[in-house]
Swiss-Prot record:
It is a multi-pass membrane protein. Transport of potassium into the cell. Likely operates as a K(+):H(+) symporter. This is Probable potassium transport system protein Kup. It catalyses: K(+)(in) + H(+)(in) = K(+)(out) + H(+)(out). PANTHER family: LOW AFFINITY POTASSIUM TRANSPORT SYSTEM PROTEIN KUP, OSMOTIC STRESS POTASSIUM TRANSPORTER. The gene is kup.
Length: 625
């Protein structure tokens, strides 16, 4: 994907990145400062308090986004790709950690990924609600319609997902640029009237606020975290745009405009403390209120689209790495490989978002649910990056600790602050995260047990090939057996002999191997092995972001083996495993039932590997775990 970024000019790529990478963090001014003061119950809106909270916001943006993500985390790339799954795969490949201890690192990666799924539910709900709530500033007439309008926008957004964002996507960058410039202009207009607000850049205001209000600071931090939501996106989308355009957009457009807008809202509060009701929209001149509401709604839809696309992409990576069951994945663009649509996840997200809006009703209520997911994800990133720096960059442990501990302490404080809101909404991301982690861990463990059972109970392939001789009837044609255990005889082959009493002239065992890299070079795609006159073994290697097309890869394999390739003379034999519970070591009964249920509902192998259905023969088998 980085090739696309390289072909385009740097400013054009930075503009495109604005619409995808910064949509989430760009909509934070709609609610972040308001929630920071709401969190500080009873704290007067005096100048020292306004400047103190603004200073905390500014330095959180600088420390967490500018230094941690932009300067450090974005250097921890997996062959150009970013995101928590890519970082986990990179660490599993590079870190010299005992297998029995890798489970802890996998758990951290799973927790971070699971919370991102939660983010995909909470972000559209809070963003769209906060934008539409601007209508209540214009007139009370709209008050009863805020929720229905927000739900209608969300439903429309999810209905068009199957068509992909390609058509409207080209407008995302320019619209988001106008949005950020609007934020900056509104801020400048207010700051000029009350320039004393620029004192927020001095850290002494933050230190003074923390010193005089230590308990209140803890509550305020739980809302200040809303200003850094979307920081993960800078890293997660790095593979699409490259680090340079993202850094360019951040330092030259996003950061200045965000800081100016927060300063402008603070200046407004210094002039009129009553504006705390909704400092963002009260910053807007009356004549520009409706255009700004429309612009804010467009910005939140773009932010939501970016998060939804991120969830689809993360799910695809998890599926290909073997952490999630196969789901149906549709490609919505012929030219852009990364534009995908996952129907099951699409409708699941839509239902969950509507339920959230109906339960919480306002963006202020949802803010409690939002912060905890963000802070925990950031903490997971910090831990995994520390492992990466130690193992890949070969830094000494003291040096790593000196770099990482300040971020770890800051984010631990943010986690603690947002944890205070568990009862008022923080339970939402925890519940979503717990469900997602359970699914990820159960599927991974279930697959391990299944493959171990197959390896243990099935005949060795080498022994089978040596002993088969001329005891079976050979029929013309090629039989391709898809198998995850290349060293044993596939169940489908055994069933073919048992029921049909035949073997094909050419029996080809194909195993798909997913590497811990985003993409595998075409020349490294295939390894082939001739086992005997009638038997061949092929391994096809893909990265976790590669397009998987087995028939296409087989053309290359046949060429290496010196065989004639004709898809219409190839039969693909696939074993449809039926998993059943057995007494003994393994998983707890409820996890086995969950795994069996997921196994039954996986997308067909033929769809996943793009094998024509008219060339597929499915044979059932039963495996006890």
């Amino acid at each position: 994907m980085q090739n696309t970024a390289k072909k385009a000019t740097l400013p054009a790529t930075a503009l495109a990145a604005l619409g995808v990478v910064f949509g989430d963090i760009g909509t934070s001014p709609l609610y972040a400062l308001k929630e920071s003061f709401h969190a500080a119950h009873g704290l007067g809106i005096q100048p020292e308090n306004v400047l103190g909270i603004l200073s905390i916001i500014f330095w959180c943006l600088m420390l967490i986004i500018s230094i941690k993500y932009v300067a450090i985390v974005m250097r921890a790339d997996n062959n150009g790709e970013g995101g928590i799954m890519a970082l986990l795969a990179l660490n599993l490949r590079k870190a010299k950690i005992a297998d029995n201890k890798k489970i802890y690192m996998i758990a951290i990666g799973f927790i971070g990924a699971s919370l991102f799924f939660g983010d995909g539910i909470i972000t559209p709900a809070i963003s769209v609600l906060s934008a539409v709530e601007g209508l209540s500033i214009a007139t009370d007439v709209f008050d009863p319609f805020i929720m229905p309008i927000a739900i209608a926008i969300i439903v429309t957004l999810f209905l068009v997902q199957k068509h992909g964002p390609a058509f409207v996507g080209k407008f995302f960058g320019p619209i988001t640029l106008v949005w950020f410039l609007s934020l900056g202009i509104l801020g400048i207009h207010s700051v000029i009237q009350t320039p004393v607000v620029l004192g927020m850049f001095s850290p002494h205001w933050a230190i003074q606020f923390i010193y005089h209000h230590p308990i209140m600071t803890f509550f305020v931090m739980g809302a200040v975290v809303l200003t850094v939501t979307g920081g993960e996106a800078l890293y997660a989308d790095m593979g699409h745009f490259g680090p340079v355009p993202i850094r360019l957009a951040w330092f030259f457009v996003v950061l200045p405009c965000l800081v100016l807008n927060y300063a402008g809202q603070g200046a407004l509060l210094l002039r009129d403390p009553a504006a705390i009701e909704n400092p963002f929209y009260l910053l807007v001149p009356q004549w520009a209120l409706y255009p700004m509401i429309i612009m804010a709604t467009m910005a939140t839809v773009i932010a939501s689209q970016a998060v939804i696309s991120g969830v689809f992409s993360l799910a695809r990576q998890a599926i290909q790495l073997g952490y999630l069951p196969r789901l149906s994945i549709k490609h919505t663009s012929e030219s852009e490989e990364g534009q995908i649509y996952v129907p099951f996840l699409n409708w699941l997200l839509l239902i969950a978002i509507i339920i959230l809006i109906l339960i919480f009703k306002t963006s202020s209520n949802l803010a409690s649910a939002y912060g905890l997911a963000v802070t925990l994800t950031m903490l997971c990133d910090t831990i995994l990056v520390a492992v990466f720096i130690y193992s890949a960059w070969k830094w000494s442990l003291p040096k790593v600790l000196i770099l990482i501990i300040p971020f770890f302490i800051l984010e631990s404080v943010l986690v603690g602050a947002t944890s205070l809101k568990i009862l008022s909404g923080g339970w939402v991301p925890l519940l979503i995260g717990a469900i997602a982690v359970t699914i990820l861990m159960t599927w991974k463990r279930g697959r391990e047990l299944t493959f171990a059972k197959l390896e243990h109970d099935t005949l060795s392939l080498d022994l089978f090939v040596k002993s088969i001789g001329n005891s079976v009837h050979w029929v013309p044609g090629d039989a391709v057996f898809m198998t995850g255990t290349p060293n044993v005889v596939p169940h489908a082959m055994l069933h073919n002999i048992k029921h049909n009493k035949v073997l094909h002239q050419r029996n080809i065992l194909v195993t798909v191997v997913i590497e811990d890299v985003p993409f595998v070079a075409p020349e490294e795609r295939i390894t082939t092995e001739t086992l005997a006159e009638h038997f061949f073994r092929i391994k096809i290697f893909y990265g976790f972001k590669d397009e998987m097309n087995v028939p296409k890869a087989l053309m290359q394999a046949y060429e290496q083996l010196g065989l004639e390739y004709d898809l219409m003379h190839i039969s693909f034999f696939i074993s449809r495993d039926r998993i059943v519970h057995s007494v003994g070591d393994g998983m707890s009964p409820w996890r086995e039932k969950l795994f069996i249920s997921m196994q039954r509902n996986t997308s067909p192998v033929s769809d996943f590997y793009q094998i024509p259905t008219n060339r597929v023969v499915e044979l059932g088998s039963q495996i006890e775990i």
